[in-house]
Swiss-Prot record:
Pfam families, sorted: TsaD
Keyword Disulfide bond: no
GO annotation, cellular component aspect: cytoplasm
Protein known as: tRNA N6-adenosine threonylcarbamoyltransferase
Catalytic activity: L-threonylcarbamoyladenylate + adenosine(37) in tRNA = N(6)-L-threonylcarbamoyladenosine(37) in tRNA + AMP + H(+)
Protein family: Belongs to the KAE1 / TsaD family.
Species: Halorhodospira halophila (strain DSM 244 / SL1)
Gene Ontology annotations of biological process type: tRNA threonylcarbamoyladenosine modification
Keywords: Acyltransferase, Cytoplasm, Iron, Metal-binding, Transferase, tRNA processing
Amino acid sequence: MRVLGIESSCDETAAAVYCGRDGLLAHAVHSQVADHAAYGGVVPELASRDHVRKLPGLVGGVLRDAGLTPADLDGVAWTRGPGLPGALMVGAGFARTFAWARGLPAVGVHHMEGHLLAPLLEPDPPAMPLVALLVSGGHTMLVQVADFGRYRVLGESVDDAAGEAFDKTARLLGLPYPGGPAIARLAVEGTPGAVRLPRPMTDRPGLDFSFSGLKTAVLHAVEAAGNDQQARADIAHGFQEAVVDTLVIKCRRAIEQTGAGRLVVSGGVGANARLRERLDEVGRASGFTAHYPRLELCTDNAAMIAYAGLRRLEAGYRDDLDFSVRPRWPLAELS
């Protein structure tokens, strides 16, 4: 089965073709980061308009790269949610029209299920059951994965997501959007231990996250630092260590509670080199292995949507011609 995947949930427009026999045949992503950088974050209306402009060309390009025509496809998968309403509608409308015009089955995919399954696109994918850390600009959650489609949310952020905290902290430090890569670069220049920030909710039972208090602590540190550039680098280092420590502590706790021997990490923050380094260290000491998608599949992409869609189409899932989207769609509602 060959499935066309379409992703448009936020500020990346993406298309991909995945084949059940041959794997990922082609994928392409157009990032709008430069367009939104001047605003310090994503402007929903601009994102939607750019999806309209870029999506047809991206789809045509991945079909050419895969050596296929629309007649060679067996299905279409698109991101139904969660995400920005207008951005989701662009992808949904295109995908459903494309599928209807060619008589192809189509299925709407949960964006976070796509991230959860992204590490399975690698040459040596982890076997289920496992625990997944999904960590991005909009979500931070730990999920127990018994099998495909059998998910139990163990914990999630009660306020800001980790990626959102990176973006807000970067803004406080005068760094560009997106904040994650900018803070990681500045953190290299920081002095270890110079700034100690809280590890929220790690001193109590449970697997939920909270990053709003950490952001407040950063604000006070920035105000105290003034224009001292070394102090700002120290804050970036301290902030990154606090987020990484929090995520690592919760991951280890989730592994201990579930007895899983495998952890998958996905989402934009999953590309953070320090997070990967620490999880690998703790995994070796605690007896679990951590698995990650390649860096280009950590951020939003259509390869993960095409793969998740293929799995759902093979399992018999189909959507009708209604292309309603779900901007808010708890993963716990997915079956």
